[in-house]
């Protein structure tokens, strides 16, 4: 059968989006891996599935597969594209949408200026909830990599993140340390790794090595995790701007127990069909 899909991106973090509300198909990890190949497939960072909800209190179910076929809990840039997609496809007329994900419910707000705000929910710091192996909860941890102690923050935004502060974003060891920390045994579910350079109290630069995808142009949950880490450690104040290789996100967080709000664009690139 032929499936209609839409190619989208949020700050260069690119997605294949499938409507499984009006189309009926069983998508497997092997399909994500096959379609995700940039040489022999469609090519994307993540595959986003729009499904009917299991929960009557939400509008849609949102599933995410990395291009390596692994299913993940959350994707912030994808959430903005999800909101733009369901509105453009007339799957809803609502400008405020509640969506269930593998890690819980998120709320999406399509603003009049075309930007999309996502209530990502409160961050989690308890090591078992990230998950991260540590004797006790702390603001910063030392993790040994190749005999060196690497200082990082660990936080969950529905998916696990490690945040490292760097002095030079252009020369940050993203491709050297990223995969080693991603697969570090203290992160049993693997981890997304953010390299953060604080410019001033309202602006920072960020590069992210994404679990299962490598370095991407942008990572919404990574930007949220980096902002939370920077605010928690007194480096920055809310609201703040995070500049990623693909563009800028605005992040707000009022502190522990409060939700993280992320605002940024979502762009449709093209429509296509793929054989299942």
From Swiss-Prot:
Keywords per UniProt: Amino-acid biosynthesis, Cytoplasm, Isomerase, Lysine biosynthesis
MF (Gene Ontology): diaminopimelate epimerase activity
Compartment(s): Cytoplasm
GO biological process: lysine biosynthetic process via diaminopimelate
Site note Could be important to modulate the pK values of the two catalytic cysteine residues, residues: 161, 210
Catalytic residues as annotated in Swiss-Prot or TrEMBL: 75, 219
Cellular component terms per the entry's GO annotation: cytosol
Chain residues that bind substrate: 13, 46, 66, 76-77, 159, 192, 210-211, 220-221
One Pfam family cited in the UniProt record for this chain: DAP_epimerase
InterPro entries (alphabetical): DAP_epimerase_AS, DAP_epimerase_DapF
Gene3D superfamilies xrefs: Diaminopimelate Epimerase, Chain A, domain 1 (3.10.310.10)
Record field: catalytic activity: (2S,6S)-2,6-diaminopimelate = meso-2,6-diaminopimelate
Entry superkingdom: Bacteria
Record pathway: Amino-acid biosynthesis; L-lysine biosynthesis via DAP pathway; DL-2,6-diaminopimelate from LL-2,6-diaminopimelate: step 1/1
Site feature location: Important for dimerization: 270
EC number(s) stated in the UniProt entry for this protein: 5.1.1.7
The family this protein is said to belong to: Belongs to the diaminopimelate epimerase family.
Role this protein plays: Catalyzes the stereoinversion of LL-2,6-diaminopimelate (L,L-DAP) to meso-diaminopimelate (meso-DAP), a precursor of L-lysine and an essential component of the bacterial peptidoglycan.
Subunit and interaction comment: Homodimer.
Entry protein name: Diaminopimelate epimerase
Organism: Pseudomonas savastanoi pv. phaseolicola (strain 1448A / Race 6)
